[in-house]
C-alpha cells in the first residue's frame, strides 16, 4: 500500500505490482504461469478443507505463502497423512504445497528491463545450496545451449509480461529432459549475481541503476568463467 501511494506521485521502479507478486507464493506462481512459464505442481492450503482437496502432490514441500526465505517456513511432507500436522506446525498460515521436483540443476537468470522496453539478461548460472543458503554459483551454468536459451527466453518473457523497469532474478529448476521450471522471483539484485562484479562486462548493481534511471542498459557478456563461494 505504501509503495502504491508513493507511485501515485513519484516513479517507483520496479513498480509496486512486482512487490505485490513477490510477497506471496500464491500470487507469484499464478503470475509466472500467466507469463507462460511452468512451475512445480502446487495447491494453495488456506483453510482446513484444502487439506483434502484433489490434486495434492506427495511427497511435497509445504511453504508459508508469505514471509518464508532461506528454508524458513517450510516443511517436507511425505504423504497426505502428514499434511495436517505440518500445517498445524506452521500455525495454520496460508501455505502452498509444492510437489517435489527431481531436478538436475538449480539455475538462475537475472534480467534487466529499461523504461524503453530494452531487455538484457545475464547468462544463466548454476547454484548450489547448503542448508537452504546459497553456497556456490558457477558462471556460466554448465548446461546445453538449448537449455540456456530456453531459460533466458523465460526470464525475458516474465520481465515483459510484468512490464518490469528494473532487475529481477528468476530462479529455475532444470529437469533431466531439459525442461525448465520457474521456482521463485526476486525483483532486486540477487546473491547469485554477485560474481558479475568481477567477471562481467556490466555488474548487476550498475545494471539495476541503469534500468531504473532510464540509462541505456550495459552489455552482459562474461569476461571470464567464474565460480563464487
Question: Can you annotate each of these PLM segments?
Answer:
Residues 54-61, 105:
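Acidic/histidine-enriched active-site and ligand-binding environments that engage anionic O-linkages
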Residues 1, 15-16, 25, 35, ...:
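Fold-independent oxyanion-binding glycine-rich loops
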Residues 149-170, 176, 186-229:
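Active-site "cap" helix and flanking loop/linker of ATP-utilizing ligase/carboxylase catalytic domains
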Residues 73, 77-170, 174-176:
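Internal nucleotide-binding/catalytic subdomain
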Residues 178-181:
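Conserved protein kinase catalytic/activation segment
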Amino acid at each position: 500500500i505504501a509503495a502504491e501511494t508513493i507511485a501515485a506521485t513519484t516513479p517507483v521502479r520496479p513498480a509496486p505490482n512486482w512487490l505485490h507478486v513477490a510477497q506471496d507464493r500464491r500470487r507469484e506462481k499464478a503470475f509466472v504461469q500467466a507469463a507462460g512459464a511452468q512451475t512445480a505442481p502446487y495447491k494453495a492450503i488456506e483453510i482446513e478443507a484444502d487439506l483434502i482437496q484433489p490434486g495434492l502432490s506427495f511427497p511435497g514441500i509445504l511453504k508459508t505463502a508469505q514471509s518464508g526465505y532461506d528454508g524458513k517456513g517450510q516443511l517436507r511432507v511425505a504423504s497426505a497423512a502428514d499434511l495436517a500436522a505440518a500445517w498445524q506446525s506452521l500455525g495454520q498460515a496460508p501455505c502452498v504445497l509444492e510437489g517435489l521436483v527431481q531436478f538436475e540443476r538449480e539455475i538462475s537468470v537475472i534480467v534487466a528491463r529499461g523504461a524503453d522496453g530494452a531487455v538484457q539478461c545475464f547468462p544463466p548460472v548454476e547454484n548450489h545450496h547448503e542448508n537452504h543458503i546459497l553456497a556456490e554459483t558457477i558462471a556460466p551454468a554448465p548446461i546445453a545451449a538449448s537449455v540456456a536459451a530456453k531459460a533466458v527466453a523465460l526470464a525475458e518473457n516474465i520481465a515483459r509480461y510484468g512490464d518490469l523497469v528494473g532487475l529481477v532474478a528468476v530462479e529455475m529448476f532444470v529437469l533431466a529432459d531439459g525442461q525448465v521450471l520457474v521456482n521463485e522471483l526476486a525483483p532486486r539484485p540477487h546473491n547469485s549475481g554477485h560474481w558479475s562484479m568481477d567477471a562481467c562486462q556490466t555488474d548487476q548493481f550498475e545494471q539495476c541503476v541503469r534500468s531504473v534511471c532510464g540509462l541505456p542498459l550495459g552489455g552482459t557478456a562474461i569476461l571470464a568463467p567464474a565460480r563464487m563461494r
